[in-house]
Amino acid sequence: MVNGGHKLVTCTVKNSRSEEAAERLAKAVVGSNLVKAAMFGADANWGRVLCAMGYSKAPFRPEYVSVAFESAAGSVAVCDKGAALDFDEDLAKKVLSENEVTIAVDVNEGEDSATAWGCDLTYDYVKINGDYRT
């Protein structure tokens, strides 16, 4: 069997200005091909998360955003209020290598939250869809 995704990716957005904004932000993160590719590669690239949030057109201030990656292997904070954090790359790799990963985003601007689900983006997915013709 060929799989297009190997892991479940959950994005939780909390402390947003509104539930609608939180939903748009979370959906943009799990829908981003760059985030999906980072999850496949177990790459703790929080810049891709903020980039996807920017594409959402939802209101947020990047300088307030904190990001952590979580799984059964632990949790690693990578960004605090828009600034990079020093973090253990080996731990981040372990956290992101699990089959279920959560991208925890705190926008630090309100009280609303939302969650969205997606998956990673694998070589097989690209191959299948690159070869597919209607």
Regions found by a protein language model. Give the residues of each.
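Internal helix-turn-beta structural module
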Residues: 15, 23-27, 31-134
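Oxyanion-binding "anion nests"
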Residues: 1-21, 25
